Amino acid sequence: RGHELHVLDGEKQYPIDLRDFSYEVDGQRHQFDFAYITIHGTPGENGILQGYFDLLGLPYSTSGVLVEALTFNKFALNNYLRSLPGIHVSDSLMVRRGENLPSPAEIVERVGLPCFIKPNAGGSSFGVSKVKTLDDVMPAIHKAMNESDEVMIERQLVGTEITCGCFRRSNGEIVCFPITEVALKGGEFFDYDAKYEGKSDEITPARIAESTADRVRETTQYVYRQLGCYGIIRIDYILSGERGQEQIN
């Protein structure tokens, strides 16, 4: 809504007709064969583009509408994952703009301190705060609400942060990429600066026991199947040091 798209050919620009995602060159109309979606956040990761392309019958590179919408909603995804056997996720609660907010004391009683307060729908750690005191709770909620009308408040997970990506081959086999360990350079958590400004080291393969790596790969493949994913995905984990207690972050 409110955007114009163009196909670029050198210095020439050809406007895209959003009614059918086609464009015209020298009186001849052209259609796309495939959409490789690389847009972060909305509308690329929350099901909006996927639904649009489904209506047009245009194949694309990501999971479908339901999976993208669910995985973009942190609180809904955590609740779904919590229902799966053997999957561990951090305790959390959600607050919404316009609703009565619990008091900082009630929030801390539920999730403890430190905790993380983050936009429920968003990426790149925009609006995320690590909260250590009661006085910081409400400012962190208001900060997160600058990015989203829904805010998730989550118990802190302590441990080593790792990430595991995977994809499905045409024969149905789900293949995991090498596991990566995220080592911060002095920051409090894996925030925007750590992700994009070089304030973290990403170590591949991760410095973890092979038995742990096997469990992480198996969990990643299991979640991929249960969600019905398509294309390449990535799941982040916190290793707590307890065998079998890898928690999805």
Put a short name on every predicted segment:
Residues R1-L66, L70-N79, S83, V95-A105:
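ATP-binding N-terminal substructure of ATP-dependent carboxylate-amine bond-forming enzymes
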Residues L5, V25-D26, L70-T160, S170-N171, ...:
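Active-site nucleotide/adenylate-binding loops and adjacent lid/helix of ATP-dependent enzymes
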Residues H40-G41, S125, L184-K185:
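Glycine-rich phosphate/pyrophosphate-binding beta-alpha loops
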Residues T42, P119-N120, R155-Q156, Y224-G228:
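Short Gly/Pro-enriched turn/cap motifs at secondary-structure boundaries
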Residues P59-S63, V89, I174-C176:
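Short hydrophobic/aromatic-enriched beta-strand-loop microsegments
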Residues K132-E218, L239-Q247:
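Phosphate-binding site of ATP-dependent enzymes
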Residues Y224-N249:
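Conserved metal-phosphate-binding beta-hairpin within the catalytic cores
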